């Protein structure tokens, strides 16, 4: 796959963009598609590379940074999406969502589809293919992709696969088997061709209405992020902390009052006991005095 001919500028090109969170193997997948190491791991900006496949197709692969990572700002995301589109003359022919069978589905993956639809428009699912990296992991376990998907497939993944018509493919980016390398690329390109046929040969973002839909998506995303930015971080947690602080303060005040009341009650009780004891002693003294006087009178008589 490394001895492919270089494409000419006049030949038709299929633009394939790789999206997904950082660490799922987008760059390695791009290298597998191109047939050589052209994309660096953990890229921080959109990169593109053209290549001619063994069957003569010209593909333009766009590797994107982790646009759906939770730490990515809206400004950065929009800038890179625009950058991505400038690298795709003729529109997008396929959007490949890259996931990994070696890691659990995280919040980034679950948020990816919503962000894709907001940024690229609702038509995105008509151009979507789900690509799973980590084929080497399943091979070691003697498992297939269907085996992996059947063992507790998350609802998010079921939804994505249903919306994109079940288009999926497994990649082993670590294999040295040339036959496997060619076969997995063929499988992905077969999905790309099916997408093209499904959409009547029309690519995404080739007409003004497509671009308008994308702009509307960008505006919605910006508005959503602006609203979120105005909210204090972890609002529920902060509110809970405030309530706990109030509750704790109230409890401490109540305890302090109880201690004070107890001490007062104890002091009052102690004082009452002393008065009672004093009264008892005085009464006993008076009684004894009366008895003593009575005895003296009896002796005189």
From Swiss-Prot:
Inducers of expression: Up-regulated by brassinolide and heat treatment. Down-regulated by 2-aminoethoxyvinylglycine (AVG), high CO(2), isoxaben, and propiconazole treatments.
GO cellular component: endoplasmic reticulum; plasma membrane
Residue span of region G4: 133-136
Record bears the keyword GTP-binding: yes
Expression tissues: Expressed in pollen, cotyledons and lateral roots.
Binding site residues for GTP: 20-28, 173
Residue span of region G2: 46-50
Family: Belongs to the TRAFAC class TrmE-Era-EngA-EngB-Septin-like GTPase superfamily. AIG1/Toc34/Toc159-like paraseptin GTPase family. IAN subfamily.
UniProt name for this protein: Immune-associated nucleotide-binding protein 5
Lineage: Eukaryota, Viridiplantae, Streptophyta, Embryophyta, Tracheophyta
